[in-house]
Structures are given as C-alpha cells and as structure tokens.
Amino acid sequence: MYDRDGVVTSTGTRVGANQSGYGADIGIPMIENQWDIFVEEAVLSNYGSGLSAGTRYKFSEMFDAKFAYQVLSNQFVPAYFNSTYEDSPVNLSSISNESKSGYFGSLGANLMDYFRFEGTYQSYTTASGLKSNTVLASLGMKEMQNVSLVASYAQPNFAGLSSLSADNATIKADVSYRLNSYSKAIIHYSKVYVTSTSVQESYATEISFELPVKF
C-alpha cells in the first residue's frame, strides 16, 4: 500500500506523505472458514517491521478471536493502514518505541453489518527488559443516515482496573456527517487521563473533501 499525499490532521499537520507499506500472510486452515493458524509479516518503509505467528478462530458470523506472538521493531505500528487511517492517522515520525516482543489477544464482534467492536490485550517485553501491558478497545460504525463513527480507548500502562482512568489512558472519537457525495464534516474528540485527578480534553472540527478519481 502507498499513500502519496498523506492525511492532514485537525491540527493542520500532514501525516503519512509518501508512506508505503507491504505485508504477507500465510494461513493454514484447520477448519475451513472457521479456524486457522498463520504467520504474518508487515513492513512500513523507513519505519521498521513486525512479525506475528498465531491462530484465528471465528465462532460465528458475529464473534471472532485472535491470539499471536509478535516481534516488533522500533517505530513499527501494527495495522497502520487500517479503517481509522483517514480519520485518525498515526504520525510515525513521533514514535520512538524500542523493539519488543510478546503476546497479543483480541476478541471482536460484528453487529448488523454496521458496527464492529474489538477489544485487545497486549503484553510485551522490550529489548532492554522493560515489561508493559496494554488494553485497547475500538468501535467503528459504517456510514448510516450520513453519519459514521470511529471511537477508541487505549491504556498503555495497564496495571489493573484502577488504572483504566489514569496513567495516560486515552479516549478518542471521530464523528463524521456526510454533507454530499464529495465532502463531510468531522468532529474530533480526545480525552487523556494524565493522572486519576488530571484530565485533558480537546475538540476540533474540519471539513473533508473527497474527489473521485478514475484511471
């Protein structure tokens, strides 16, 4: 995948210009269309790579799960080009993580073909021996009645239920309203729990234009 122009954030910063990435996924089906084991590798040009091996299981059309062991180089962001890329892009140049390895587990749910919820737990050890536990949650809503939603929660320093609203836990939400075929209005919301008693909130609005291009 290649993004020539990048994405302009609500603060006016252009993120991801000339960024490319590629990946490979080898899966071995254990139960057709339900359970497989896999090996994945992804590379972000100039920003490292990630290797993952694990298993995926689909309980039904509604629920699914994934468990894997991962090895990630510094500055690599898994799922960088995901469904939230246009609304909430990650500035790779601001990432200064150490290389790390550890376990990843997620549970997902699809509701009425419009909603997707996913909860994730990660436990990593860095190259220097530091351990970290991260809890992530995301909710996406496809465009319905001209409205779409992307919301996320992240706690990079998870240490039990008491840490869910402390230690840099972050809530983000982007609500989009389609004005016409070529533009939409977006409200960005962010809330950061610096400590259990200190909270930072911010709002921003923008108009996004989409120009159809045919080749």
Segments predicted by a language model, with ranges:
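Signature for the C-terminal beta-barrel architecture of outer-membrane proteins
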Residues: M1-A169, Q200-S202
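Predominantly the C-terminal beta-signal and adjacent terminal strand-loop region
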Residues: S73-V90, K172-F215
